[in-house]
Amino acid sequence: MFYRNYLLFLLFLLASKVFSTEYEIQAEIVEIDTQKNLIKYLEKVTFNSNEISFKANKVIVNQNNERIDASGSPIELFFRENGEKINGQANKLQIIQNTLFLRDNVIIFRQGNEIKTQEVKIILKEND
């Protein structure tokens, strides 16, 4: 148990260099590829940060190009815009620096409206 918690803490520290924002990822299975500089989180994955939270089947953190890729059926996500909580879902999610991309059967719920599309790009706030 201690080893698993220590490993997850270490992974969090390594992965947190990807973004200027702090975040936490939890998963049933974690795989580290030190040659490709990838961390894979598999099964019941949850991602939480100040800006965005989501649940997915799989998340890959690529430290080479500062990118997070997630997939699910669907991914359930929550984010804030000007203090307003917005819910959504998509089959694919990507975070590159401070930009969130949602792809494949995207649905956004905002102010009682439902927006359906195949792709959405959202600029997240930069941290001070």
Where do the protein language model's features map onto the residues?
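N-terminal amphipathic/hydrophobic interface segments
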Residues: 20-128
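Bacterial N-terminal signal peptides that target proteins for export
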Residues: 1-7
